[in-house]
Amino acid sequence: MAEICYENETMMIETTATVVKKATTTTRRRERSSSQAARRRRMEIRRFKFVSGEQEPVFVDGDLQRRRRRESTVAASTSTVFYETAKEVVVLCESLSSTVVALPDPEAYPKYGVASVCGRRREMEDAVAVHPFFSRHQTEYSSTGFHYCGVYDGHGCSHVAMKCRERLHELVREEFEADADWEKSMARSFTRMDMEVVALNADGAAKCRCELQRPDCDAVGSTAVVSVLTPEKIIVANCGDSRAVLCRNGKAIALSSDHKPDRPDELDRIQAAGGRVIYWDGPRVLGVLAMSRAIGDNYLKPYVISRPEVTVTDRANGDDFLILASDGLWDVVSNETACSVVRMCLRGKVNGQVSSSPEREMTGVGAGNVVVGGGDLPDKACEEASLLLTRLALARQSSDNVSVVVVDLRRDT
């Protein structure tokens, strides 16, 4: 009897387990089916109709509340992501704050004008370069810029002047960053420039009308008068007979001295080196070169040297403008006359009287011998002044190329 009861109890337990298992399986199937149906409803494309105007689409199935709940959930998660991203951006900006370079104040850009004309010469051998902010000095709140301008008067051919135009400002920047002494850095810059020109001639890398046939290329050289303008100083380095003139309180002040063979100290130096100055259409080194210093002219070394004379002038409130020009201007126009012409232009007394397209009258303007860096445009008044000086030189029968740079130094304009 006990065995029958035990067997019945065992069968009942197995039957109950089977029923529970079937019920559980059925429930899971129903839950899975319900979940799949819900998923299909969520993923199916809702039919909606457009209404005129800017109203939102109206859903036909009346599921707007569920849609809004989903949108609020997405918006919350998006806000969280945006907040985290914003925090990362802030941290990144804080980490980079020490490396951010302040842009120069637009008012700090120099006002200048350039004119370079072939004049009565058959070939254009002058070159001009202007590089605003060619060297920058970063402070905590601003970027102080140094401005560079230079005039190069070539002789024998144009390739030395062109090389100076392309390279000398880079050498000046490199040397000044290595040693802040302007006189030493300028001297090293000119020496390196001279060595590069000599190497250029020896290697035959330049392509020009002298055809690199020695000794023709050894007879090619260029003057160089360059100026670096800082907020406190006017630095001028000169090698040759181009010139820099400052107008201060209406008076002309020469910031360079022409290197002519008959200048007493230059004559003594040439003779001490074993050279001679022969008067042939004016004083000339060995009767050939009308200047005692130049970049290049390898065949006249050591009598003709490339070492520049450097002047450093403190800027003052009375500074009006600076003129750099080749001897094509200074041979026929005095310092005082040149300053008077520029002063009239800057005061607007000749505004509109100078043609804006001088190429039709003067060969060489815009002929590719002028390089301007920094992305800014020349000042109209300074441009008119430089162009008027070239016209004055031609009117006074200048027989040379004429190149002029005018820089406005007034602080209140």
UniProtKB/Swiss-Prot annotation:
Keyword Magnesium: yes
Subcellular location: Golgi apparatus; Nucleus
Protein name per Swiss-Prot or TrEMBL: Probable protein phosphatase 2C 78
Organism the protein comes from: Arabidopsis thaliana (Mouse-ear cress)
Residues of the PPM-type phosphatase domain: 111-409
Induction entry: By abscisic acid (ABA). Induced during leaf senescence. Induced by osmotic stress.
UniProt KW Cell membrane keyword: no
Assigned EC number: 3.1.3.16
Protein's gene: SAG113
UniProtKB keywords: Golgi apparatus, Hydrolase, Magnesium, Manganese, Metal-binding, Nucleus, Protein phosphatase
Organism placement in taxonomy: Eukaryota, Viridiplantae, Streptophyta, Embryophyta, Tracheophyta
Disruption phenotype annotation: Delayed senescence. Increased sensitivity to abscisic acid (ABA).
Function according to Swiss-Prot or TrEMBL: Acts as a negative regulator of abscisic acid (ABA) signaling for stomatal closure in leaves, and controls water loss during leaf senescence. Activated by the NAC029/NAP transcription factor during ABA signaling in senescing leaves. Functions as a negative regulator of osmotic stress and ABA signaling. Acts as a negative regulator of response to drought.
Main localization of the protein described in the UniProt heading: Golgi
